[in-house]
């Protein structure tokens, strides 16, 4: 595909303008089911977000991919404020459509549960090609923003894929096929990644446009190698500064292992700083000193170099790989006859139409 582009909230840009990219992060979370888990997920401060983004830019960063889907924190208008504040500094924002893990949706009455897959695909396609709904598909009224989604999210739970999650994976794959839009999947604690990748590919998605997130929380370098070699997808390691799960050194050494195996083209990085105390400027509003997006540059990249990851590999991880995986693909038609037998059998077993 000539003239490869990524879709930001302010319009399509050549992928060469993405620069150093954080492939999975958050600025605004305007409520939703995550807030019931912890109040730190409520993130409404536009000024703090702009300051955080500027610190990211000051250290050489350019693009942030915000992975908040409709009804799980996404705020189109506030994110547009942030994007407009940093556009002249070289900052870009990509937003998502799609879904999170099944835990966040009523299994009987949510629109993910009751609306036919074909219609949900149309709704997601519209968010990518016409504009995101400012009301996040919260009710019967839809108001399209000028801002379009540039990535599709799906999610799975811990150690299992719920039937609604398989439905959301089908929506993501079919939407990607029809629009060329890339996909990123939340896997709870890095489990079910291999199955997620195989299901997406089984529905017809291009593995070159798929990122699987959170495998850093399942620190098994041999599993990473297996997922990449068997499916060809990209792993988004989104967890520097998460010592409650593992030390940074373990993540750095696991990345080094993959690079040494010749798999550096299948790695992206991010901070996934989706809580108030994961960002420096939000932390200050609560009277606390915390790390933030600058941690990637100040602490983690020097550590990658210390463990022996080459500058060339780091450039691939931060620039070349996001440029490839976030570029829109050629549009295709979805052919149900090409869906894998394994996926069709699983749909039947889970009673999915």
Curated annotation (Swiss-Prot):
EC no. given is 3.1.1.104, 3.1.1.25
Per the record, residues carrying N6-carboxylysine are: 153
| Residues engaged in binding Zn(2+) 2 | 153, 186, 214
Cofactor names from the entry are: Zn(2+)
Q: Which residues bind Zn(2+) 1?
A: 24, 26, 153, 272
- UniProt entry tagged with the keyword Hydrolase: yes
Q: Name one Pfam family in it.
A: PTE
Q: InterPro entries recorded for this chain?
A: Metal_Hydrolase, PhFuoseLconase, Phosphotriesterase
Q: What reaction(s) does this enzyme catalyze?
A: a 1,4-lactone + H2O = a 4-hydroxyacid + H(+); D-xylono-1,4-lactone 5-phosphate + H2O = 5-phospho-D-xylonate + H(+); L-arabino-1,4-lactone 5-phosphate + H2O = 5-phospho-L-arabinonate + H(+)
Task: Tell me the cofactor note.
Answer: Binds 2 Zn(2+) ions per subunit.
Keywords, in A-Z order: Hydrolase, Metal-binding, Zinc
Record-listed substrate binding positions: 244-245, 275-278
**Gene Ontology MF: a single term:** zinc ion binding
GO annotations under biological process? catabolic process
What this protein is reported to do is described as: Catalyzes the hydrolysis of D-xylono-1,4-lactone-5-phosphate and L-arabino-1,4-lactone-5-phosphate. Also able to hydrolyze carboxy 1,4-lactones.
Family listed? Belongs to the metallo-dependent hydrolases superfamily. Phosphotriesterase family.
What name does the UniProt record give this protein? Phospho-furanose lactonase
Q: Which organism is it from?
A: Mycoplasmopsis synoviae (strain 53) (Mycoplasma synoviae)
């Amino acid at each position: 595909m000539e003239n490869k582009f990524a879709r930001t909230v302010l319009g399509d840009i050549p992928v060469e303008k993405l620069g150093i990219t954080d492939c999975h992060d958050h600025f605004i979370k305007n409520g939703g089911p995550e807030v019931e888990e912890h109040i730190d997920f409520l993130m409404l401060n536009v000024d703090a977000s702009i300051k955080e983004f500027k610190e990211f830019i000051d250290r050489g960063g350019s693009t942030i991919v915000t992975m908040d889907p409709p009804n799980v924190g996404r705020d189109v208008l506030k994110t547009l404020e942030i994007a407009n504040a940093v556009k002249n500094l070289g900052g870009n924002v990509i937003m998502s459509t799609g879904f999170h893990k099944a835990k966040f949706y009523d299994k009987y009455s949510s629109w993910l549960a009751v609306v036919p897959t074909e219609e949900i695909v149309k709704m997601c396609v519209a968010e990518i090609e016409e504009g995101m709904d400012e009301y996040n598909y919260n009710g019967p009224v839809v108001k399209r923003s000028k801002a379009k989604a540039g990535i599709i999210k799906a999610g799975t739970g811990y150690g299992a894929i719920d039937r609604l999650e398989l439905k959301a994976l089908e929506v993501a794959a079919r939407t990607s096929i029809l629009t060329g839009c890339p996909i990123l999947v939340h896997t709870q604690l890095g489990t079910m990644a291999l199955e997620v990748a195989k299901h997406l590919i089984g529905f017809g998605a291009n593995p070159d446009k798929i990122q699987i997130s959170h495998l850093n929380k399942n620190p098994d370098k041999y599993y990473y190698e297996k997922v990449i070699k068997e499916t060809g997808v990209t792993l988004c390691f989104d967890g520097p500064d998460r010592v409650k799960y593992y030390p940074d050194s373990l993540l750095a050494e696991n990345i080094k292992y993959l690079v040494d195996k010749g798999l550096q083209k299948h790695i992206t990085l991010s901070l996934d700083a989706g809580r108030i105390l994961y960002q420096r400027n939000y932390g200050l509003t609560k009277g606390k000193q915390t790390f933030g997006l600058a941690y990637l540059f100040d602490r983690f990249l020097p550590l990658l170099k210390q463990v022996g990851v080459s500058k060339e590999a780091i450039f691939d991880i931060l620039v070349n790989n996001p440029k490839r995986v976030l570029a829109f693909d050629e549009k295709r038609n979805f052919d149900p006859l090409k869906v894998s037998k394994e996926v069709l059998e699983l749909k039947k077993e889970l009673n999915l139409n």
